A protein has these predicted regions:
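Structured, mid-chain assembly/scaffold modules that mediate subunit interfaces
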Residues: 42-201
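Generic hydrophobic, helix-prone segments enriched in Leu/Val/Ile
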Residues: 37, 54-56, 107, 212-219
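Generic N-terminal initiation segments characterized by hydrophobic and/or small/turn-forming residues
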Residues: 9, 22, 130-132, 138, ...
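N-terminal-proximal low-complexity accessory segments that begin disordered
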Residues: 1-70
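Extended, charged amphipathic alpha-helical segments
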Residues: 196-219
Length: 219
């Protein structure tokens, strides 16, 4: 009987050892190494940089432009002006260091290199609008956390999940301004977090670098 050539163990497939696991088991022990190698290519490889820049340029281009389309031209004009004001770094970024377009460009890059990024919604006092964004790298998820805040839930990879595998909270490591890790992580409810990553399998719980399939070739 002839089955699938892809499943044969002949000369062409010799040495190709594979097995099936859940996405989380497959990713868990490789995620950090893949991310570190992707970042090394980002820093040191001209080919890697050309890929990253082309991706960012094609995905984001010159940035977002809001086009309000209410029935009132006056309201449309006011909303457009307010949007432009909010996009300034002092209004949209909790650190006041990046404009909204710069934030989005960085997010596109971190998505490709790191596999994802977390946006935390921060509600502030005062300002143009009492709302700003905080960007958190996926490294800052506390993978040592194991005790859920809610009975019946499970903590995996620094994220608390309910029985339906829905994220309900994030354990975030804390660092001082010089980058030294502090002892106690902060728990942030999922309703305040916007995770940006690509889910490729139903059993996948966290991100993996988009560069994973090409890292060995680029190197």
């Amino acid at each position: 009987l002839r089955g699938y050539d892809a499943a044969s163990h002949g000369r062409l497939n010799s040495g190709w050892r594979v097995f099936n696991e859940s996405a989380e088991l497959t990713d868990r022990y490789s995620r950090d190494v893949i991310r570190a190698r992707a970042r090394d290519l980002e820093r040191n490889s001209d080919i890697g940089q050309s890929v990253i820049r082309a991706f960012r340029r094609n995905v984001f281009g010159k940035g977002y432009k809001l086009q309000p389309k209410t029935e009132s031209e006056l309201l449309n004009d006011q909303l457009g002006k307010l949007w432009k004001q909010w996009c300034r770094k002092e209004n949209c970024d909790i650190t006041a260091s990046q404009s909204f377009n710069q934030i989005m460009r960085m997010a596109a890059t971190r998505k490709q290199v790191d596999g994802g990024i977390l946006f935390v919604k921060r509600y502030t006092r005062g300002g143009l609008v009492p709302f700003k964004l905080q960007m958190i790298e996926v490294d800052e998820l506390d993978t040592t956390a194991s005790i859920p805040r809610h009975k019946g839930n499970t903590v995996v990879g620094g994220i608390e999940y309910d029985p339906a595998r829905r994220a309900v909270g994030y354990f975030i490591q804390q660092y001082d301004v010089e980058g030294w890790k502090l002892t106690t992580p902060v728990y942030i409810e999922a309703k305040y977090v916007i995770p940006y990553w690509t889910k490729r399998r139903p059993s996948q719980l966290r991100e993996v670098s988009d560069l994973a399939p090409t890292i060995t070739r680029v190197r």
